[in-house]
Amino acid sequence: DTPLSITAVDASLLESRNQTDLAQIAAQAPNVTLNAMGGAYGSSLGAAIRGIGQFDFNPAYEPGVGMYIDDVYYATLTGGIFDLLDLERVEVLRGPQGTLTGRNSIGGAIKLYSKKPSSEGGGSVDAVYGSRKRTDVRASANFTLAEGLYGRVSGVLKRQDGYVSQMD
């Protein structure tokens, strides 16, 4: 039990809403703005919780919203448009989180938790093909390495041609 404002989204809810990247989570978390930002340093995440955050893609600035992947702090939101692949849950904690998560979370924190390997073997593959040769493949597999030792692998491939063909 956590005595704070939190929005938790589990894997089944992510799948049923067809949410595939982090910017789509803001639609179900009040007072949260997550925007995909283009920039010179790669695709960035503009994040603000309760009006506190950063919409500058410069990696020299530290964000006011903390990003954590499996409880490991992600120091910049540059490149922060993550595909929501093979996740157990996503948590959005609103308000200052310095006591719970540490530094750079004065506005709040976004926490991603990966699925853990288990004794149940299996996997999944999702594929999309669309206009301009768009190809999206998302796959994950769970397997046994040795008795009592399990592994999990997941990956994403995204490709799409542009609108214009270069004629040399």
Task: State where each predicted segment sits.
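A general structural signal for stabilizing positions within well-ordered secondary structure
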Residues: S16, A23-A26, I81, L100, ...
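Short beta-strands and strand-coil junctions in structured, solvent-facing domains, enriched
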Residues: E15-S16, T33-N35, F55-F57, Y74-T76, ...
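Extracytoplasmic beta-strand/coil segments of soluble accessory domains associated
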Residues: P3, A23, A27-V72
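N-terminal periplasmic "start-of-domain" segments of outer-membrane beta-barrel proteins
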Residues: D1-R17, L45-A48, V65, S118
